[in-house]
């Protein structure tokens, strides 16, 4: 507990220091005018400080609980974290350089140690003399797809976490070329993107399990027809002689109603898996934004298959249980069918800068679900406060019913 208390004091000091600097900066900006603020800068950067505390309650009925707490039984845990994300950009007449990273300090009541991690999420160079065309080289996050909580066409990037789809993701080292030829017959705009992504022990080695060496080539064709965006994706894996493809679309049916979808085919040795997504975004007259998505993945387990996995873990057989546990932990998407619903209300009761939201993530196969309630308040510039509550629920041998976390 001593490291956790020390970290608490450190977070408070950081918060007070950051608050003082922000207030002084705001006071000075009220009566200052700098011409340089309106001229293009060679170097620009922005950062923020996030201090978060969490209280967790563990699900002692979960079949995973004995593996996590074999000797010391725990029912609750308190976590503290400090995050400092940084974005930086250098501009020259002929090129640009981008850096995106994050430094994090975390501590937990379950451990006597404080962890420090630094992640370089993006770092790439861009040749700017070819505008509107582009050549980029370095660590890049492509952000393919139109989905919010899921991204089936993320063929050359790390998948989103549907429980926190807005979380920062780490990019991959690659070379990318973008060609924008202009409008073609019947199309308002179009573009062609070519990607080369190498996989070696020291380059993108953690991209996929059991992948030591590979050369992956990617192609993206984009077009705009009226108010509808279309994208076609194609990837070729040289060593595995595998070709994957997919497409997506997004269409504004009206000023407050949008529909989007994705489809991808992923070939794995002798198997072919498909992933699909269909979703909408709708803004009501009373400022409620609805985001609804349905997701299907044939590589996921059926209800019977997942039930068998949980029963095997529960059996406690040293070899079989550990094998099943490893297989479960390696899958971000466990089952085949999910639904995602989020409702966000802007400034209810005329409460300025206050936005509550409610999210429901459900496993349609086993009827278990995860509910996240968030309250966001940003009363002044550069300050934001968030309070959230997460509750997982489900029967025995279901994804969220057997989750180690009960609520947070």
Regions found by a protein language model. Give the residues of each.
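Transmembrane beta-strands of outer-membrane beta-barrel pores
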Residues: 51-59, 90-94, 103-107, 141-143, ...
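Residues on the lipid-exposed face of transmembrane beta-strands in outer-membrane beta-barrel proteins
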Residues: 82-90, 122-127, 175-179, 219-223, ...
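Repeated loop/turn-to-beta-strand initiation elements of outer-membrane beta-barrel proteins
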Residues: 93-99, 132-135, 184-190, 225-232, ...
